[in-house]
Each structure stands twice: as structure tokens, then as C-alpha cells.
Design a protein with these regions (language model features):
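NAD(P)-dependent short-chain dehydrogenase/reductase
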Residues: 1-33, 38
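Active-site loop of classical SDR/Rossmann-like NAD(P)-dependent oxidoreductases
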Residues: 10, 67-69, 87-106, 111-117
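Conserved short hydrophobic patches within well-ordered secondary structure
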Residues: 11-15, 19, 44, 116-121
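Mid/C-terminal beta-alpha module of Rossmann-like enzyme folds, strongest
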Residues: 15, 21-23, 44-47, 51-92
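Residue-level detector of conserved, well-ordered beta-strand and adjacent loop positions
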Residues: 28, 62, 103
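Amphipathic alpha-helical segments that line or abut small-molecule/effector binding pockets
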Residues: 39-50, 119, 123
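Amphipathic terminal alpha-helices
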Residues: 112-128
Length: 128
């Protein structure tokens, strides 16, 4: 979940803070992370609750696309115009989150989880 909490307790703000302040960190080469804007998350949940969809059900609310951690770091480097100080280690795993149930809601709300989504998150939560 990406938002402007001001805390460095999620991977998005941790990487941004580390790159910006030249703090070395480790990148798990095989790991993926799912990043979704808190506003998109809210809109999806709000729509589901207000339309009484999926009553008494467990559903996944996530970005339909998870990002490889090295790709996240590379995208941040490109956005910031600055190299990150990191070591890559052979750890982590890819995981899939089934978001098929919320696809109609995503389409209804016109939320675009396209190739530029990560860039839009960077621009929204870390103005240059």
C-alpha cells in the first residue's frame, strides 16, 4: 500500500529514502512486491462496500500486476536520476495475487494498472 503516511515502513518509501539519502541496502533478486496507491485501494473497497458486492466473501484487493524488486529499484533510479547503493542477493520469490474478482470494479472505476502505474506512484508521492 503506497501513500503519504510519512513513515518509512513500507518497501516503496524505504527504497526512495535509501536512494535519496545514499543509504546502502540489499535487493532480493527473485522477490516481487505488489504496489497499489492507497487512493485506488480505498476507491475499490468503497465501491465494493457500497454496492454490497461479495457479501461474506474473502477477496483480494491488489494491483493485478506485481513488480520484480530489481525493477522497482531501477524505476526509482531512473525517476530520481540517481544510482542506488545496493547489493543484490539471491533471495525471494515471485507470488501471484488473484485479482479476478475485482477486475469488474477496476474497470468500472477506470483505474489503470498499466505500464506507467509505478511512474505515477513515484510522481504522486515523491515530487522532484
Amino acid at each position: 500500500l503506497v501513500g503519504s503516511s510519512g513513515k518509512h515502513s513500507n518497501i516503496f518509501t524505504f527504497f526512495l529514502n535509501s536512494i535519496t539519502h545514499n543509504i546502502p541496502f540489499k535487493v532480493w533478486a527473485n522477490a516481487t512486491r505488489n504496489l497499489i496507491d492507497v487512493d485506488d485501494f480505498y476507491d475499490i473497497v468503497h465501491n465494493i462496500l457500497n454496492s454490497n458486492m461479495y457479501l461474506n466473501s474473502i477477496i483480494n484487493i491488489a494491483n493485478p500486476r506485481s513488480y520484480a524488486v530489481p525493477y522497482i529499484v531501477e524505476s526509482m533510479e531512473n525517476y530520481l536520476g540517481k544510482r542506488a547503493l545496493y547489493d543484490t542477493i539471491d533471495k525471494g520469490a515471485d507470488f501471484d495475487i488473484d485479482t479476478a474478482q475485482i477486475q469488474p470494479v477496476i474497470e468500472k472505476l477506470n483505474i489503470s494498472f498499466d505500464d506507467a502505474y509505478l511512474y505515477r506512484l513515484l510522481k504522486k508521492y515523491h515530487e522532484l
